[in-house]
Amino acid sequence: MTEHLPMPQFGPLAGVRVVFSGIEIAGPFAGQMFAEWGAEVIWIENVAWADTIRVQPHYPQLSRRNLHALSLNIFKDGGRDAFLKLMETTDIFIEASKGPAFARRGITDEVLWEHNPKLVIAHLSGFGQYGDPQYTNLPAYNTIAQAFSGYLIQNGDKDQPMPAFPYTADYFSGMTATTSALAALYKVQQTGKGESIDIAMYEVMLRMGQYFMMDYFNGGEICPRMTKGKEPYYAGCGLYRCQDGYIVMEVVGITQIEEIFKDIGLAHLLGTPEVPKGTQLIHRINCPHGQLFEDELDEWLANQPITAVLKRLSELNIASAKVLTIPELEGNPQYVARESITQWKTMSGETCKGPNIMPKFKNNPGKIWRGMPAHGMDTNAILKNIGYSDEQIRELVDKGLAKIVE
């Protein structure tokens, strides 16, 4: 890698250069993770039109912090040349587009490897780089990937399926790009040979929706959707109402079932053929007493405040938690102790508040060192970093191939 762009050195990925081209959430989320873990991350934007995420009032300050902003037309003339020159000093390149869009425009894996044989290339799209032509070139967002993967149909309630929000497929796919690119980089460091990764968002969600799908693939059984937030198969698991709000709980384990049955007045069922000794889960459908257990549990919970319920469930070693509202997060003692929510300065000097770096590395922690850069803010510095003169940069700008902030 060439000399770093100006930034502090920190985290487990200090010294790694990552470049990404993509808008909105999925692809940029991958880049964001690298940036928070110490990599030097360059965000490529269109010259004429900035990333559409910029229209949001607050989210971009989180999703684009720690980045370097390059505004460059990478598919045309001198802009393409500058992009390929940048690839020579890049460790990981992530692009999010419709199928093989880069290859269609002449930037194939082979072209990139001609300029950098060690380059890790991550292609992120809705339907993959190859397959049935009626799908590979289609646009895809969160809901599209959820719908096509079998993930969406499993969510919602018995009356209607519904997507899991916010933007689950985007974040899962972005994190898949991050982890797979790191796996590829590890191998490149051993072999010296680059890698290309084909990440289809629908396949990511297919994998994430795997749990109950296996019952269908191997037995033809379709799992029912939830009812009012309760786990479809197992009683005592899911969302429950108390006097003053909601909790979630998971009644799993021999001792846990025995003790909760005693508390709610069902001790006489323990040791029966339907609830034999050693029962670890109560099947909502197959157990004749599954619905009775749910009904008694609902009544027991509805007549108590959350604090009392959580205290008793903790005594019984039953996993549970209050469903926190967003305003409750900041003052929660666990959030405070771990600084899960933090503040940083935007490029305009304003204070922004949001989630802190995760996960927490003990010896090489991540950090927030910069707010979201303006459109084209670092174009000049990046082009100079890869060897361009002031005159060459001005020529790109005059031709509309690059944008700089004066």
Curated annotation (Swiss-Prot):
It is an enzyme of class 2 (transferase). InterPro entries: CoA-transferase_III, CoA-Trfase_CaiB, CoA-Trfase_fam_III, CoA-Trfase_III_dom3_sf, CoA-Trfase_III_dom_1_sf. Its main location: cytoplasm. One of its GO terms (cellular component) is cytoplasm. The active site is at D170. The keyword Transferase applies. Pathway: Amine and polyamine metabolism; carnitine metabolism. GO terms for molecular function: L-carnitine CoA-transferase activity. Keywords: Cytoplasm, Transferase. GO terms for biological process: carnitine metabolic process. CoA binds at K98, R105. It catalyses: crotonobetainyl-CoA + (R)-carnitine = crotonobetaine + (R)-carnitinyl-CoA; 4-(trimethylamino)butanoyl-CoA + (R)-carnitine = (R)-carnitinyl-CoA + 4-(trimethylamino)butanoate. Pfam families: CoA_transf_3 (PF02515). The keyword Cytoplasm applies. It is found in: Cytoplasm. Its EC number is 2.8.3.21. Catalyzes the reversible transfer of the CoA moiety from gamma-butyrobetainyl-CoA to L-carnitine to generate L-carnitinyl-CoA and gamma-butyrobetaine. Is also able to catalyze the reversible transfer of the CoA moiety from gamma-butyrobetainyl-CoA or L-carnitinyl-CoA to crotonobetaine to generate crotonobetainyl-CoA. Belongs to the CoA-transferase III family. CaiB subfamily. Homodimer. This is L-carnitine CoA-transferase. It comes from Proteus sp. (strain LE138). The lineage of its organism: Bacteria, Pseudomonadati, Pseudomonadota, Gammaproteobacteria, Enterobacterales. The gene is caiB.
